[in-house]
């Protein structure tokens, strides 16, 4: 089975995951009761969807098949995915389409900014596909989107979730210089899984990227997330936490991997809520300012509320250090 989807133009059918078509179908495990969600039907959801379509925007909520879309869109929260809906990578877990991307939409920064203002967002999350085809990996486009939002909605805090800018010298520095409030780059999984789960990326490059953000701007909040249920061992997750703390990462998110189609990496296990709580406790003991760990945790879920708590946690830490 190969999924076909186009959320903006339903008539433009295309193979979504051509690189996975040759793979044998894998069994999709039945979800336990603790990760069941209701279908989105609310008025708020419909209004958010209408704004997204009006401005011809792409959201990771739709493209990645996020289970929290109903809850977030009902509250007028959305994570905008810039630089198109086609990614140059082919991660085994991801539902975003793979292929040759289109040219950048030069009107996109202004369109995103208009949507942010229209939705009255106090906090916005901007992510993107990987654009290995671009000389700077899309750094300039990130910069333009941040600037446009600042101009249209100055009070809105901005969180970015970036690709790894692998082999793109100067790209990270350009994005950090644009001064987002939160810089998020997801590790996704433990290093032992990278060859099968995230083959186009390099674990220690991603760790170094997060570390470099703090070197460039020590005041910038950094954030990273992983999925569990991909066959990792507990000790591997704890080592990853240590690696992130070595890079001075402030905020860690941990959520359950959910298999998009039979062609994607299979779910090896459903991690229990108690185990997620245990990971949260350990992560706090290692020094993270904020930890979100639950089956339905995703990078942008409750991002606005979490940002307020993140700021409060830093202020508390600074006050305690001054005493």
From Swiss-Prot:
Main localization of the protein described in the UniProt heading: cytoplasm
Keyword Transcription regulation: no
Catalytic activity: [[Fe-S] cluster scaffold protein carrying a second [4Fe-4S](2+) cluster] + N(6)-octanoyl-L-lysyl-[protein] + 2 oxidized [2Fe-2S]-[ferredoxin] + 2 S-adenosyl-L-methionine + 4 H(+) = [[Fe-S] cluster scaffold protein] + N(6)-[(R)-dihydrolipoyl]-L-lysyl-[protein] + 4 Fe(3+) + 2 hydrogen sulfide + 2 5'-deoxyadenosine + 2 L-methionine + 2 reduced [2Fe-2S]-[ferredoxin]
PROSITE patterns: RADICAL_SAM
Co-factor binding details: Binds 2 [4Fe-4S] clusters per subunit. One cluster is coordinated with 3 cysteines and an exchangeable S-adenosyl-L-methionine.
Binding, [4Fe-4S] cluster 1: 61, 66, 72, 300
GO cellular component, one term: cytoplasm
Cofactor(s) of this protein: [4Fe-4S] cluster
Domain Radical SAM core: 73-289
Compartments where located: Cytoplasm
Annotated InterPro entries: Aldolase_TIM, Elp3/MiaA/NifB-like_rSAM, LIAS_N, Lipoyl_synth, rSAM
UniProt GO molecular function: 4 iron, 4 sulfur cluster binding; lipoate synthase activity; metal ion binding
Enzyme nomenclature, EC number: 2.8.1.8
EC main group: transferase
Binding of [4Fe-4S] cluster 2, residues: 87, 91, 94
Family: Belongs to the radical SAM superfamily. Lipoyl synthase family.
HAMAP family attached to this UniProt entry: Lipoyl_synth
The protein, known as: Lipoyl synthase
Protein species of origin: Rhizobium leguminosarum bv. trifolii (strain WSM2304)
